[in-house]
Amino acid sequence: MVKSFNLKAIRFAVRVGNIVAPELTARATFKLFCTPPRARRLSQKEAAMTQRAEQRLASARAMDLAYRKGPYFDDAGRDQTRDAPRDETLRYYVFEPEAVSADTQTVVLLHGWTGKSAFMLGFIGPLLAKNFRVLAVDLPAHGASSARQLHLPKAANALSELHQQTGPWHSIIAHSFGGAVGCVLVSGFIPSFAKVPLKRLVLIATPHSMQWIFHGFGRAVGLNQRSQTLFDGLVRPLAGRPLGAFESKNMLRDADVPTLLMHAPDDKEVPYSGAELMAGGQRCVTLLPMPGLGHRRILYAAKTIRAATAFVCDADLEHSPVAG
């Protein structure tokens, strides 16, 4: 997130702000944190795959969902989202199998930070071949969806409304930040959002802790302890819970949904140790190491797509706890 900005200038401003205006500094840092770069440089392989994916998107039914901004919680913890305007739009693409029937179920694809739905389209063909309907979503502030900022509660809010319009859903397949969104949805972890019932959840290179992400960002831009505490505290009014509560392991435990974690031990962006923590001792969670695939290559690997499809399709798959 920080690489796309002038980090040296940001660190200088934060160093001054820590002293003279810590609250303003925390709010400005939060806005920066929640603002995805408009585009990142794609590798040659990513660019070629994205071009093919964009062509495939043209064959889908493109839909826009108008949703309310939020959530917003007052000082007493009451959700005020119902009073927010419905002036944001979420773009999603609907792919239908050839033989739609009463038994056709829906799988939702969620991309990661700075991604878009086109990055997830490697899963489309195999899922359609198994007679699933597929929804490929552009998260807020990404792809063709509106908004300029995105955080976990905002994503959960938009996806909860999408579920109300298009559910029930059979499964979610999600990468990185999208996996964190999936954890929130399936657990109903944010107050006022009901659990999204699923039969399967596939998480690819998903972070285990929002606090770990916040503190890493704070160190990168130079927040001192007071400003970091204020920065962390901005989560509760948006999420109805403190930052430290957002641990994926706890959300997966509360969800109790069969879950497949795929993570590369060589991932340099989201550490593999987090996946081990998420899976450790969990009855319904299976960890599948994917060595050599890093944080982004894992998304396009044939074995990742095969494993995700098999997991979603296997109604009789048994899950055993994976030790951390």
Residue ranges and their predicted role:
Residues 293-305:
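Catalytic histidine-centered segment of alpha/beta-hydrolase-like enzymes
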Residues 149-170:
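Alpha/beta-hydrolase active-site loop
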